[in-house]
Amino acid sequence: MANGLNIGSLKIDDSQRPAGPNTTGRAAYIPPHLRGSVARPPMGLDGSGPAQAVPGLNASTWAPNNAGPHPGAGHNWANAQNFTPRDRPPGAPAGPPSMNGNTTWGNAPPRQFNANDYGKPGPNSFRGSSYGGGRSGGTRGIGGHGYWDENGKHAQGPENKRLERELFGEADDPTKQHTGINFSNYDSIPVEASGHDVPESITAFTNPPLHEHLLSNIVLARYTVPTPVQKYSIPIVMGGRDLMACAQTGSGKTGGFLFPILSQSLHTRGPEAEAARGLGRQQKAYPTALILGPTRELVSQIYDEARKFCYRTALHPRVVYGGAEMGNQLRQLDQGCNVLVATPGRLVDMMERGRISLAHIQYLVLDEADRMLDMGFEPQIRRIVQGSDMPDKHMRQTLMFSATFPPDIQKLAEEFLKDHIFLSVGRVGSTSENITQRIVECESDKDKDSALLDILCSDSTGLTLVFVETKRQADMLSDFLLDHRLPATAIHGDRTQRERERALELFRTGRCPILVATAVAARGLDIPNVTHVINYDLPNEIDDYVHRIGRTGRAGNTGISTAFFSRSKNFKIARSLVDLLKDANQEVPDFLEKLGRQGNYYGSSGGGRGGRGGGRGRGGSSSTRDIRRTGGGYGGGGMGGSRPAYGGGYGDSGAGGPYGYGGGSGGYGGGYGGGYGGGGYGNPSGPTGPSSWW
């Protein structure tokens, strides 16, 4: 009936163009104003007449009927006048003839789209190229990326000078850290490694041999010899052992875990990502190495280091952290991920979204592990390590690095480690002798402001990092400095990630040489050329002080640390501060020495080595010692003087006995004339004191 339908002069038969020889089924609908007209070729873009076919495309079905190139453009992008062809890397297959005229950009032929293959890894001929299904994330052998050849051996990609300058900088680049005048003194730093069958330390990066492609990047980074922590950690990790490494700040801990992990990863190709099934399904990343850090700034810094040493390799480091746009991070993961650097919160979020699987993890690294395992992060760490598909500790290597490992954190960390080696590098207290430490007594904020202005106005060289306790104080102090025409900026947890990154960039480049920060910037940040650290507000824990001042005096460079000490607010760390200064051969002010003795007398100092009382301290020097050998506890013992300090606390046994209440050397305060002492039941407390069940 429809075929005979006639509405006025319009027939439905006229609305259908007959099917052509290359079409199937019903042909296209013809609007009324074009019915009965003769088909003509389309006009050119300038309206001057029929479009001409593009040279080189005459064999296509659409070229004769489509417009030519846009005025001013080359015939196609590969043959344009401003196009510079790139050479194909050795061993890479040639592209199809249509792509190999004057350029070799096409390293593999395009595939037909199949909705059911979305997200799957490509076949061998596509892997390592932009056509491969998501693993390598870049064109094969182009842009500073390597690839895996058909035999599964790693092939180094070509040089990319622009990327090289971005990653490694120039020889005199002020934004990059270079070794200082005291770097050679690192060889004299004492090292203690405990555990059975500890591998011998190395003296050069080539023994045991790191992968040659990693070594070339180490040379570009101008690293000549390994630091003490690297001399021990590289053979330990390459030997398959778990590690807890305690090393002074600025001693190369990041390289201590990155170098062996990347070297091992370059010897053996990791597993491919699981294929996503069905149209629109999202690909899941399967990293083989996971590095966790407590702050966004620290993981960003580790990621930058990983990018540097993955240059011209097929390894792809990625970073995920909160406060940044998630979409971009997900797109980066879709391009492939071998090494994942993350903060715990964002990682858990992405795991719950099904975008990251930890099933193939071979290496788990906790940087600044003492903070990662404290009460704030412990639930998230357990969710990641014990509540996911991550292999258990017997099927992976676990590495922990920090400047301090208090005894309670060491006990907790043993849940995640297997038969680990404890590495202690540096002096007791974990501060560097490269740092000159000064303590200034300031009771009020007005006194601190005056002293701060005197310091900043008299020393205008290098970068100055000022630590305060609260976010509000950070903003107020930076405004105060700006009012006095001093270029300052602030960084703290209430600032957006973009603002924090901007502040760090201004500080790193020296355009704003004074940075006021809360503890968010204290842990692990490696900012080159920081010459002065000022503790406007001292922290409550001596371990936090160690981490703060470690932002200067890095990689053998010298630095200055100034702390404003308030008797009313900082009295409880006086004893620990005195011991720390003495251990680092620093001058101890008279007022602080007197306060330290008072702290011993009343047992108010927060834990330490034998000579300190205190409540629930952290064992003093045992923060850098293996509790399996030295013992330790929450108090660390008492004063051992003429009056009892009643310090100490519940702790592990020391070397002197199996059940000591004091841990280390010292028990409940030392008592009268040396009594009530001893590290364990029945051990004498001193040369004249009798045995005591205390």
UniProtKB/Swiss-Prot annotation:
Top-level taxon in the UniProt lineage: Eukaryota
EC number of this enzyme: 3.6.4.13
Residue stretches making up the Helicase ATP-binding domain: 234-423
Localisation: Cytoplasm
InterPro entries given in the database record: DEAD/DEAH_box_helicase_dom, Ded1/Dbp1_DEADc, Helicase_ATP-bd, Helicase_C-like, P-loop_NTPase, RNA-helicase_DEAD-box_CS, RNA_helicase_DEAD_Q_motif
Compositional bias ranges of the Gly residues kind: 130-146, 604-620, 630-640
Residues the record lists as binding ATP: A247, Q248, T249, G250, S251, G252, K253, T254
Motif (DEAD box): 367-370
Annotated ranges, domain Helicase C-terminal: 434-596
Keyword check for tRNA-binding: no
GO cellular component, one term: cytoplasm
Catalytic reaction equation(s): ATP + H2O = ADP + phosphate + H(+)
UniProt short sequence motif Q motif, positions renumbered to this chain: 203-231
Chief site of localization: cytoplasm
Enzyme category, top tier: hydrolase
Protein keywords: ATP-binding, Cytoplasm, Helicase, Hydrolase, Initiation factor, Nucleotide-binding, Protein biosynthesis, RNA-binding
Record text about domains: The Q motif is unique to and characteristic of the DEAD box family of RNA helicases and controls ATP binding and hydrolysis.
Entry similarity comment: Belongs to the DEAD box helicase family. DDX3/DED1 subfamily.
This protein's name: ATP-dependent RNA helicase DED1
Source organism of this protein record: Ajellomyces capsulatus (strain NAm1 / WU24) (Darling's disease fungus)
